[in-house]
């Protein structure tokens, strides 16, 4: 059977928004300056990388980045890339009220429409955190796919909502928490799985307020880890989606750009590989797996 391996870069433009909403840098001029680097220097460097190898990409942008880096965002659109939603200030959906989460989503949609001329079809939850209404809001506002959950790794699926589980409460009897997870119901939202082991940020970006922040892991090690994952997928699967999550904050650094060149050139040696946008992945999945209602 011929191989069909869909490969994609998802670029999260966290920039200043990441420091405001997730990384604890909202009071640090130095950390904010790192966010400015991501938008003003990092975006053009990644665009140059994608142009060199003729690759499409999907850029998931906080609304804050769209408004703060309007010139660079226009460059992304002019290059023909897809733009998806990623919060406004990289807010944690779990921490927001239902109204706050919807207001942020609506603002994101509005900004992307103004930028690209069309509504976004895809969403990435900041910090990959899904609230108990995120799925409902995405479907309500016309989204086709999400890229935040991890029920699988290299195969898309339909998002399920309503899973429930019992947390341990040592003030109760053990029988009160010894219960299995109960699965909810499938929805129309396509999930393109997220994967912490194909994300550049945790190992290669130093965050002062994060206890598990590294920032100085060698790109040679990370690059080999990503190549090893691709090699296993190519050997074991005839159809698969291999999506990598990167950030201009991290992947626009020289040592990481060189890592990506090696990964791209390695992947391109294989037959049956196609570089695509995330929207193309979702459309391909829907054709292969029409949902039975």
UniProtKB/Swiss-Prot annotation:
Top enzyme class, one word, equals: hydrolase
Asked if the Swiss-Prot or TrEMBL record annotates the protein with the keyword Membrane, the reply is: no
Induction comment from the UniProt entry of this chain: Its expression is markedly up-regulated upon cell exposure to oxidative stress. Is also significantly induced (3.5-fold) when H.pylori cells are in contact with macrophages.
Name of a matching Pfam family: Polysacc_deac_1
Q: Which annotated residues bind Zn(2+)? A: 14, 86, 90
> What temperature-related properties of activity are listed for this protein?
Optimum temperature is 50 degrees Celsius with acetylated xylan as substrate. Retains about 80% of the activity at 30-55 degrees Celsius.
Instruction: Describe the protein's quaternary organization and the partners it interacts with.
Output: Homotetramer.
What is the name of this protein? Peptidoglycan deacetylase
Organism phylogeny: Bacteria, Pseudomonadati, Campylobacterota, Epsilonproteobacteria, Campylobacterales
The record's gene field reads: pgdA
């Amino acid at each position: 059977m011929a191989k069909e391996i869909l490969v994609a870069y998802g670029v999260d433009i966290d920039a200043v928004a990441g420091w405001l909403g997730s990384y604890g840098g909202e009071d640090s001029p130095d950390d904010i300056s790192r966010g400015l680097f991501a938008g003003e220097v990092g975006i053009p460097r990644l665009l140059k990388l994608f142009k060199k190898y003729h690759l499409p990409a999907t850029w998931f942008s906080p609304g804050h980045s769209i408004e703060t880096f309007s010139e660079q965002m226009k460059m992304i659109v002019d290059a023909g890339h897809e733009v998806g939603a990623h919060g406004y200030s990289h807010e944690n959906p779990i921490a927001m009220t239902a109204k706050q989460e919807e207001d942020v989503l609506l603002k994101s949609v509005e900004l992307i429409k103004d930028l690209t001329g069309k509504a976004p079809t895809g969403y990435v939850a900041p910090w990959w955190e899904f609230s108990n209404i995120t799925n409902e809001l995405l479907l309500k506002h016309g989204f086709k796919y999400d890229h935040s959950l991890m029920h699988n790794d290299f195969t898309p699926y339909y998002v399920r909502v309503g899973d429930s589980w019992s947390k341990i409460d040592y003030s109760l009897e053990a029988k009160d928490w010894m219960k299995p997870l109960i699965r909810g119901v499938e929805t129309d939202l396509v999930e393109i799985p997220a994967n912490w082991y194909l994300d550049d940020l945790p190992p290669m970006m130093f965050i002062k307020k994060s206890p598990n922040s590294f920032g100085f892991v060698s790109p040679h090690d990370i690059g080999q880890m990503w190549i090893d994952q691709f090699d296993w997928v190519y050997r074991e699967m005839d159809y698969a989606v291999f999506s990598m999550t990167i950030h201009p904050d991290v992947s626009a650094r020289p040592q990481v750009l060189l890592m990506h060149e090696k990964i791209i050139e390695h992947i391109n040696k294989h037959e049956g590989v196609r570089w695509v946008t995330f929207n193309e992945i979702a459309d391909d999945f829907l054709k292969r797996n029409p949902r039975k209602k």
